[in-house]
Structures are given as structure tokens and as C-alpha cells.
Design a protein with these regions (language model features):
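Basic, short loop/linker segments at the boundary and entry of helix-turn-helix/winged-helix-like folds
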Residues: 1-31, 344, 348, 352
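Helical catalytic core of nucleic-acid polymerases
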Residues: 2-5, 15, 22-23, 48-58, ...
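Anion-binding and metal-coordination hotspots
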Residues: 19, 30, 37-50, 61-425
Length: 425
């Protein structure tokens, strides 16, 4: 690895005293510890004093936990550059196919408990709860003449009033900012659906994995619980990272959670990207769906399941209808409840959406490899490397922490492919 391109910075020190630690040695220390599931700065500090392998790797460095934590905080750009340098090396070793990648996301818990995540509705309940307590304490004071009991009740009353005021102020602030949810410890984290656990306060970690050797090429962290809006963003980053040209389109596999018209249109406009996205089921389970109506591009008409022709209505909205045929159609109850009959909307991007459906069907066998391709790295990150929650706070810092985990996974993957002597050579 070319250390000069990483641009790690030394820890800032006073004019007197020992010189700062070598940042490359600090970086090696982080990779070793993450590789072995040691993540917190205090645990790393302990290992630096007793772990023989780590003492050898770092030339006997024994930094304290604050220095260790500050290195990660002060070298965000350098850590991201290191990830990109890893990918460049893996590409040189021909470990990246540059033909097919799979994109998926997983929820990683934030350093913010569910208790410290509030919504307007939750605040209303808390305010009501403390209001009831205040009334109860006032009632007890009016009925109690014993000094010791009175002092205890007054103390509880004071705390209840303070809590009520705190929640009312927080509610007013949230309403002023126009937000319905707020995390009190990590302000960027959000409550999200977590597999098998209902909901939790978390971040949405996105990875794109190359099909050849399961190397994570691109990674990102989002605050949006849904994967929608992430398709083109991740596909574009991956194409840029791998220097894909328009002559060699990159096939991107993604599940139905990424199906979004705007993203599919952007992918279609970018000739470097060939998006194969699972098609979600249409809303509603009863009656005929839009996909049951066949469009004839030459005649600009739709043919319904009953064989009737729907022509374009002369108006601003591109609707295709046939009120007369619908009125006497025996399948009307299965098709629509509208008195005017069934209307099919065809917007300007309908052709792209139809080609996306066709592309998915034509590449279904390739799409089936998506799950084992992209889920495998997430399993390794969580089960083997212990990456089930973030230790840092705010989006900027958790992105940095995520890069370290992804580099560790990629290193672990490469060491399973090559023997160490081969890799050193």
C-alpha cells in the first residue's frame, strides 16, 4: 500500500514531551484489533499492553484510550482513502470482476437507546404521565401533615414538574423544527425496523459487493430506514470506484426495496449501469392489475383482459380509458369501482419502467445469486467481527467507523483467498 496517498495525521501534542505516535502504526493497530473483534478504545488500550502480536505489530506502542479514539476521529478522510486504496490493490490482484455487483442494506444499532428516542406522541404521553403525578402529589400534600412525608412528596413534586417542563420544551422545539422524531444521544440516528427485534434506534448501512470474490467495493451509511433512494446513489459510487466506462456496463442487482421510478430512470440514463431490480407486487390483491393490460406502442393503445381497447384520453393526464366498454363489461367488478370505468395511467417514464421489468425477468437466474452474494458479507461483519452496533455517534463518525469494519472484512476475505506469503510478495 502506498502510505503517501493516505495522508494520516499525527496526534497534536504539546511543544514538550515525547513525539507523537506513528499514524501508520496506529492504523495497523486498528485493523488488527477490528480483525479480532476488539473494538472499543479502552479494550484496545489493554491489548496494547499485554498482546504479544499487537506489541510486535506496533513496535511496542502503548497509547492510552483517548489517543486511540482521537486517531479515528482525526483521520476520517485518510481512513476513507485507505478503503479506496484497498480496492485499488484488490483490483490490481484481479480479485474484482467489475461485471456484476449486488447492493443491499442492513440496520446497525446506534449508540442511542430506544428510551432516548422520542416522538411527538411519546412526548404527549410523558407530559400527561407527569401531569397526573403532579396532581397526585399535590393531593397527598393537602392530606399529609407529617413533616418527613411532606418533604419526600415535595421532592417528588419538584422532579415531576422539572420533567414535565423538559418534555414540553423538547416538544415545542421539535414542532418548531418540523420534525416528528428525535434521538437525544445521537441526533442523527433514527428508529428503524430491525430483523426479528421489532424496532430499534439504528443506521442503515449500505454495501455493494462484487460478484467475483465477494469484496465490498462501496459502502455508505444512511439515516433513512428505507432502501429507496439508495439504488442510483450506490450504483453510481460503485461505477466511479471501479472506473467503469459506458462501453462496459456494470450489472447491479438489488431487491424490491430499491424499486423506485426516479432511481430506475437515473440508472437508465447512466449508460454505465445495468440495473436488475426485483419487481414489487402491485398494491391490492383483488382484481386486474396494470400489468394485466397489454400496451401496443405502434397504435398507442392498451388491451384489457376482456379484449377491449383503451385509447388515450384527450387531456393533460395521459390516461387510457374506454367508458362504453367498461359499462357493459362482465368483469367490471373485478376491475374497477369507478362509474367512468377503468383508467390506465401511462407517464413519460413508463417505457423505462417496462424495460426494467423485462430486464428483471430476463436476468432472473442471475438475480437469484443476489442474496448469497450480498448477505454473506453482512453475516461475516456481524457474526465474526462483532459489528452489530456502532460505538461512535453522529452520521459523520459512524461512516468513519463503518469504513474500518469494511476494510477489516475485505482484508479477512483476501487472506482466505491468498496465503500470507503470497500476499506479502
Amino acid at each position: 500500500m502506498d502510505e503517501s496517498v493516505l495522508k494520516f495525521t499525527h496526534s497534536s501534542t504539546k511543544s514538550t514531551g515525547r513525539p507523537p505516535y506513528n499514524p501508520i502504526s496506529m492504523f495497523k493497530m486498528y485493523l488488527y484489533c477490528y480483525f479480532n473483534g476488539i473494538r472499543s478504545s479502552r479494550k484496545i488500550e489493554r491489548e496494547c499492553k499485554r498482546n504479544i502480536e499487537l506489541l510486535w505489530l506496533t513496535n511496542g506502542l502503548t497509547p492510552d484510550h483517548k489517543t486511540i479514539a482521537n486517531f479515528r476521529k482525526d483521520n476520517k478522510k485518510a481512513i476513507e482513502s485507505a478503503h479506496k486504496e484497498f480496492i485499488r490493490i484488490f483490483d490490481k490482484l484481479k480479485l474484482i470482476g467489475k461485471e456484476v455487483v449486488a447492493i443491499d442494506g442492513t440496520k446497525i444499532r446506534a449508540d442511542n437507546s430506544r428510551k432516548n428516542n422520542v416522538t411527538i406522541n411519546k412526548l404527549n404521553k410523558l407530559i400527561e404521565y407527569h401531569d397526573e403525578n403532579i396532581h397526585e402529589y399535590l393531593k397527598q400534600l393537602s392530606q399529609n401533615d407529617i413533616a418527613e412525608s411532606t418533604d419526600t412528596i415535595k421532592s417528588k413534586l419538584k422532579k415531576a414538574r422539572e420533567k414535565k417542563q423538559e418534555y414540553e420544551s423538547l416538544k415545542a422545539q421539535m414542532e418548531s423544527d418540523g420534525i416528528r422524531e428525535k434521538s437525544l444521544i445521537d441526533p442523527d440516528s433514527r428508529r428503524m425496523g430491525v430483523a426479528n427485534k421489532g424496532t430499534d434506534v439504528a443506521y442503515n448501512v449500505q454495501n455493494s459487493v462484487d460478484a467475483k470474490e465477494h469484496i465490498i467495493v462501496t459502502t455508505d451509511v444512511a439515516t433513512n430506514p428505507a432502501d429507496q433512494t439508495q439504488l442510483y446513489a450506490m450504483a453510481e459510487k460503485t461505477a466511479n470506484e471501479l472506473n467503469i466506462s459506458e462501453d462496459e456496463a456494470l450489472t447491479v442487482l438489488a431487491d424490491k426495496g430499491y424499486w423506485r421510478k426516479d432511481d430506475l430512470v437515473e440508472c437508465d440514463n447512466d449508460k454505465r449501469i445495468n440495473a436488475v431490480v426485483s419487481v414489487p407486487k402491485e398494491q391490492g390483491t383483488k382484481g386486474f392489475r396494470k400489468s394485466d393490460f397489454i400496451y401496443d406502442e405502434d397504435k398507442d393503445i392498451y388491451t384489457c383482459p376482456a379484449g377491449n381497447t383503451l385509447t388515450r384520453w384527450k387531456g393533460k393526464t395521459p390516461n387510457y380509458t374506454n367508458p362504453k366498454a367498461c359499462k357493459n363489461c362482465p368483469y367490471k367488478d373485478k376491475c374497477t369501482k369507478s362509474k367512468r370505468g377503468r383508467a390506465i395511467l401511462r407517464d413519460e417514464h413508463e417505457e423505462i419502467m417496462e424495460s426494467s421489468v423485462k430486464r428483471y425477468k430476463d436476468n432472473y437466474e442471475l438475480y437469484r445469486s443476489r442474496q448469497q452474494l450480498v448477505e454473506h458479507p453482512f453475516g461475516t461483519l456481524k457474526r465474526s467481527l462483532g459489528f452489530t452496533y456502532f460505538l461512535t455517534r453522529t452520521l459523520e463518525n459512524v461512516k468513519n467507523e463503518n469504513f474500518l469494519h469494511v476494510m477489516t472484512y475485505n482484508l479477512k476475505r483476501v487472506l482466505n483467498i491468498f496465503r500470507v506469503p503470497e500476499l506479502v510478495e
